[in-house]
C-alpha cells in the first residue's frame, strides 16, 4: 500500500473524531518518526495505527479510542484478528 493511500484512509476514519487537519498532521508526523517512505509495509502500518490509538486516548478516552482503532484496522484490511 502506498503511504498516501494509508493516510487517506486514516483521515477518512479519524477525522470525524478529531478533525481533518489533526488527523492528517498526526498521521504524517508518526510516519516521519517511523521512517515510512513512499510505501508503507504491514508492520509499519500496524505501528502507525498503534501510535495513533495512543494519541486518540487523550482526546476520546480509552473505550472510544479502542473502537476507532478497530474501525481503522478493518479499513486497512487487518480483519478482526489483528
Residue positions per predicted region:
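Short leucine-rich amphipathic alpha-helices used at interfaces
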Residues: 1-2, 6-7, 36, 42-44
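N-terminal acidic leader/helix
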Residues: 2-31
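Polar/charged alpha-helical tracts
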Residues: 5, 29-32, 47, 70, ...
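Amphipathic alpha-helical interaction surfaces
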Residues: 13-20, 32-37, 54-62, 78
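Short, charged early-sequence alpha-helical segments and their helix-coil boundaries
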Residues: 37-72
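Short, charged, intrinsically disordered terminal tails
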Residues: 68-82
Amino acid at each position: 500500500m502506498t503511504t498516501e493511500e494509508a493516510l487517506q484512509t486514516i483521515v477518512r476514519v479519524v477525522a470525524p473524531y478529531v478533525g481533518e487537519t489533526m488527523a492528517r498532521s498526526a498521521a504524517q508526523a508518526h510516519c516521519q518518526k517511523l521512517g515510512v517512505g513512499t510505501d508503507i509495509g504491514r508492520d509499519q502500518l500496524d505501528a502507525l495505527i498503534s501510535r495513533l490509538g495512543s494519541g486518540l486516548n487523550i482526546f476520546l478516552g480509552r473505550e472510544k479510542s479502542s473502537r476507532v482503532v478497530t474501525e481503522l484496522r478493518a479499513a486497512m484490511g487487518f480483519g478482526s484478528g489483528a
